[in-house]
From Swiss-Prot:
Keyword S-adenosyl-L-methionine carried by entry: yes
Enzyme class: transferase
Family: Belongs to the radical SAM superfamily. Lipoyl synthase family.
Keywords per UniProt: 4Fe-4S, Cytoplasm, Iron, Iron-sulfur, Metal-binding, S-adenosyl-L-methionine, Transferase
EC id: 2.8.1.8
PROSITE patterns, per database record: RADICAL_SAM (PS51918)
Matches recorded under PANTHER family: LIPOYL SYNTHASE, LIPOYL SYNTHASE, MITOCHONDRIAL
Protein name listed in UniProt: Lipoyl synthase
Coiled coil, from the record: none
Length: 321
């Protein structure tokens, strides 16, 4: 059996090169076998893209990344056009290789020590009031990147004292307590970590992750910061049943998670996990009713919902679909 070639630092692996390195074989989808997108998933482009160009220019100027671009989010046009963005720190190369995700895999470069300051300056220049900070997985770092998160939060608040910050963190595999110790010095206004799918689908969708570890991360943060909302998100359409999703919602509530996002999985390329089905809006509505009954303070459920989609409105408790 041939061993994978040694990864070179800074080289991005995408599509076939990326998924070739996971234990579950992904068969490239043929066009005739791919499900046709239903009408409710048609993305409307904005009338003006000027704001989008301005935000992209600001990101390029400071060498920053947005998960909106790196993960090929379908809501990029809408969010950018409304002057919001989710910033991705710690580079654009992930040490994991989840086959649902379009972010590149490889050996990341060392963290940019100037990134926290550049990020804070960019947010000030963009006059944002609510930001989401996320990252690639950095299993190569002793703290999983926790200190860099804390540094970014601190610098952002120095230049933007009235801002609200949501963090969408990785699972800090094997380093949960150490990471939370570090983050306790600079806690966010909302703490988000996505479970992504039901536990039965972790082996194919989240190689290297563990369902219970992710639940424990959310619960332990909440135990340390009982007044800070915790949040998690799930994709639908990977082959899970609605009852499996319902059970995940119950698990989240039993681990004191208060905010929820449910959205439709979209296949980034033929080399990624295929869409098993497109979930009708009515089923998202039914799960929204269940989430409310379970006691989530806010649940955004709909085909186009993503974890950071209109995150400011989610934090305010306003309906997002």
């Amino acid at each position: 059996m041939n061993r994978p070639e040694r990864l070179q630092p800074g080289v991005k692996l995408r599509d076939a090169d990326k998924v070739a390195r996971i234990p579950v074989k992904i068969v490239p989808s043929e066009r005739e076998t791919m499900l046709r997108k239903p009408d409710w998933l048609r993305v409307k482009l904005p009338a003006s893209n000027q704001r989008i160009l301005e935000i992209k220019a600001a990101l390029r100027k400071n060498g920053l990344h947005s998960v909106c671009e790196e993960a090929s989010c379908p809501n990029l046009s809408e969010c950018f056009n409304h002057g919001t963005a989710t910033f991705m720190i710690l580079g654009a190369i992930c040490t994991r290789r989840c086959p649902f995700c379009d972010v590149a895999h490889g050996r990341p470069l060392k963290p940019d020590a100037e990134e926290p300051v550049k990020l804070a300056q960019t947010i000030r220049d963009m006059k944002l009031k609510y930001v989401v900070i996320t990252s690639v997985d950095r299993d190569d770092l002793r703290d999983g990147g926790a200190q860099h998160f804390a540094d970014c939060i601190r610098e952002i608040r120095k230049l933007n004292p009235d801002i609200k910050i949501e963090t969408l963190v990785p699972d800090f595999r094997g380093r949960i307590d150490a990471a939370l110790d570090i983050l306790s010095a600079e806690p966010p206004d909302v703490f988000n970590h996505n479970l992504e799918t039901a536990p039965a689908h972790y082996r194919k969708a989240r190689p290297g992750a563990n369902y219970q570890w992710s639940l424990d991360l959310l619960k332990r943060f909440k135990e340390r910061h009982p007044h800070i909302p915790t949040k998690s998100g799930l994709m639908m359409g990977l082959g899970e049943t609605n009852e499996e999703i319902a059970e995940v919602l119950r698990d989240l509530r039993s681990h004191n998670v208060e905010m929820l996002t449910l959205g439709q999985y979209l296949q980034p390329s033929k080399f990624h996990l295929p869409v098993v089905r497109y979930v009708p809006p009515a089923e998202f509505d039914e799960l929204k009713v269940l989430a409310d009954e379970l006691g989530f303070t806010h649940a955004a459920c709909g085909p186009m919902v993503r974890s950071s989609y209109h995150a400011d409105l989610q934090a305010q408790g306003k309906e997002v679909k």
